[in-house]
Amino acid sequence: MSRYLKHFTAVGDNKSAVPTWHEEDTSHHVTTLHDAPDGLEVSTGQHLGQLSFRDSLRKLYSTERFQIVVVCLVVLDAIFVLCELLIDLSIIEADHHRIAPQVFHYLSLALLTFFMVELAGKIFAYRLEFLHHKFEVFDGIVVVVSFILDIIYISKEDAFDAMGLLILLRLWRVARIINGILVSVQNRANHRVEKLKEINESLVHQVNELKEQNTKMDQENVRLRALLKDHSIDF
């Protein structure tokens, strides 16, 4: 199963930990991008007070709040696109001047602009690592194509109507929205997994400490028993 899941990772995932799931139980010192203190790169060794702009972006993209915001914006984009699609199919009657479709389109384009900025930030923050995650790359391609098609639609709306490509544009946007939701949900799930790993490592550390204390107490008990026996004291 892991052979297929390794292709659907998001930036910031520990790619080396995907093929063998049992390694998570045997190795508790593997540090991922999300595990690094305050989002620092593992190889940099930078001090906590010297966060670069790239490190700040990595930290931002790994936070659960940001993922929640992205999911909300994607759902909002889905509502706008759905309204546009219903108007295009004449299920909902548009006003005489067709102001409502334009409003929905520009609102959706504004959200697409945000996703373009997010994509640029991810590429800047993760660089070549971004290309290793096919799910993110596919989402980025869909975002860019959707943005270009929306810009072309604004300048040549009549051409889209004549060629019958408007519905195709909407359906392409729906595909982008579905993929965006999948990526966002996956990122949130990965973030929760990392949190659970941290809790598990903390519990393992506590168990090891308790075992060490128990061993010391057993040794002390043996020493005291030997001392009492040397002094012929029964107990």
Curated annotation (Swiss-Prot):
It is a multi-pass membrane protein. The segment S4 is probably the voltage-sensor and is characterized by a series of positively charged amino acids at every third position. Unlike other voltage-gated ion channels it lacks the pore domain. This is Voltage-gated hydrogen channel 1. Belongs to the hydrogen channel family. GO terms for cellular component: monoatomic ion channel complex; plasma membrane. Its main location: membrane. It comes from Danio rerio. Residues 87-103, 156-162 are extracellular. Residues 1-65, 127-134, 184-235 are cytoplasmic. Mediates the voltage-dependent proton permeability of excitable membranes. Forms a proton-selective channel through which protons may pass in accordance with their electrochemical gradient. It holds the Pfam family Ion_trans. Gene3D superfamilies: 1.20.5.170, Voltage-gated potassium channels. Chain C.
